């Protein structure tokens, strides 16, 4: 079913399904009542007879493999003229301004590339790669009770090269040599979407938000139910509408970002057995085997009876000749 062929009283769920606008608005009202007083309430409007719903969509991380971050941001770097630099002693590193407030809050694994201006001393020749320590430095916000260590004295050129390819993820700095990151399984982030955005568009928006180098075709969105049932959202579906249809409570159903090749759909018939212990499942298997054996015996007896009837009929035909 194409969107152009839909009546104005219906809203598309996918390319082959739709829902009545009045029914969807009723579900939206329930959704907003559940999130009353919170930022997750959804707004709706109509444009040329088309219902558009927009707001924040929670997506949980369900990745098993690390994701690679982009080495450079899309934003243009700011180059300061050499006259603006004050003369410094060559044996001291460039100091970074410390945050005024030590407590920094972030929603989800926020990834921000850190760029510094290049000094005129580095523009005269090619930069050499500086060897990095395998351990990552922790920021002041992540370790409030850690004793502060005096930073090692570096040459200005070396310090500039280190800052140039550095990323910040929740206060942790990652160099481009180790710019891989695995979000905690089940941790939640959110993106602002609308009801006209397909699964592929939402994936692209989420990956761009965190500067993930991997393409959207390598990932998929799944609806994971409390029972263990897992359904993959097709590329033609609309995640925000799917969220409304499954209700506002994320304890019952959540949207997960998973790898396209590792995510597996779990139908309802299988999900109802997931939470049972192994001894109980073994007893189910034994019962099914017994039932299977009884069915085999019944079919065998039926086949033998039919075979005997056919043989008797053939003998009668031969005697008649």
From Swiss-Prot:
Tissue expression: Widely expressed. Frequently down-regulated in tumor cell lines.
SUPFAM superfamilies given in the database record: Ubiquitin-like
Keyword Phosphoprotein: yes
Modified residues (Phosphoserine): 141
The SARAH domain, residue ranges: 270-317
Subunit structure: Interacts directly with activated KRAS in a GTP-dependent manner.
Its biological purpose: Potential tumor suppressor. May act as a KRAS effector protein. May promote apoptosis and cell cycle arrest.
Annotated protein name in UniProt: Ras association domain-containing protein 4
Gene: RASSF4
């Amino acid at each position: 079913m194409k969107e152009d062929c839909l009546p104005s009283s219906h809203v598309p769920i996918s390319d082959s399904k739709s829902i009545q606008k009045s029914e969807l608005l009723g579900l939206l009202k329930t959704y907003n009542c559940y999130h009353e007083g919170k930022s997750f309430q959804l707004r709706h409007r109509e444009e040329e007879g088309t219902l558009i719903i927009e707001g924040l969509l929670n997506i949980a991380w369900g990745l098993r493999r690390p994701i690679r971050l982009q080495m450079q941001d899309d934003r243009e770097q700011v180059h300061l003229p050499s006259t603006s630099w004050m003369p410094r002693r060559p044996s001291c590193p460039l100091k970074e301004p410390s945050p005024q407030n030590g407590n920094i809050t972030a929603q989800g694994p926020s990834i921000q590339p850190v760029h510094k201006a290049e000094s005129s001393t580095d523009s005269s020749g090619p930069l050499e790669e500086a060897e990095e320590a395998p351990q990552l430095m922790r920021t002041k916000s992540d370790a409030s009770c850690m004793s502060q260590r005096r930073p090692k004295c570096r040459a200005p050129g070396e310090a500039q090269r280190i800052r140039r390819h550095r990323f910040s993820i929740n206060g942790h700095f990652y160099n481009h040599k180790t710019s891989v990151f695995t979000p905690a399984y089940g941790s939640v982030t959110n993106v602002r979407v609308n009801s006209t955005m397909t699964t592929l568009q939402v994936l692209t928006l989420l990956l761009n938000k965190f500067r993930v180098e991997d393409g959207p075709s390598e990932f998929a969105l799944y609806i994971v139910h409390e029972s263990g049932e897992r359904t993959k959202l097709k590329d033609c579906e609309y995640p925000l509408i799917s969220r409304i249809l499954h209700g506002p409570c994320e304890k019952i159903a959540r949207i997960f970002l998973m790898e396209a090749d590792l995510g597996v759909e779990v139908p309802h018939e299988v999900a109802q057995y997931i939470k049972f212990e192994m001894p109980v499942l073994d007893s189910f298997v034994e019962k099914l085997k017994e039932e299977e054996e009884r069915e085999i015996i019944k079919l065998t007896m039926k086949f033998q009876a039919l075979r005997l009837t056919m043989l008797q009929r053939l003998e009668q035909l031969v005697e008649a000749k």
